[in-house]
Amino acid sequence: MKTQVCITVDTEFDIAGAFADPARCRPVAQQSVLCEIDGRSHGLGFMLETLAAHGIAATFFVEALNSLYFGDEPMRVIAHRLLQAGHDVQLHLHPCWTYFRDPAWRDRLASMPPNDSVAGRSEEEVQALIAAGLAAFARWEVPRPVALRTGGLHVDLTVYAAMHRQGLPVASNVGFARKPPPPSSI
């Protein structure tokens, strides 16, 4: 009997030091995913070629809140490329991108650093984050996701309650080697 494995990939843009040094650093969009050197992709393109060469489909958890900084087009193009290559596209959320909603975000850094954890928030806050991610998927005209992976795999029971209320029945938030959940809660 063959072992069944689900290959998953987080597909996300990079804050690239913008919170640590906002005067010199800016977030990076497609290049952080494509990793192009001399016109050849050593990131997403390489992964898609390798998966195709072996007849393997993967699930790509596509981060949606980056649209608050970059707009919809950069990640929409990537999501469509993944779908056209026959892969599954699901929702990934890094709440730190919501920091860019405030035009004075640079000034706030000293007194209120960004929080990239979905855990520890109220259910209403988590539902709003999920709703924003789902809205991005709708604007990108990609199928509505059924699964969520939180940034950094941060999770608590509130996240699952919010997922349920937002119609997301599948979670991919637990990575025991990376971020074990508190034993009593999950």
Features from the language model and the residues they span:
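Catalytic alpha-helical scaffold of carbohydrate-active enzymes acting on polysaccharides/glycoconjugates
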Residues: M1-A147, L153-I186
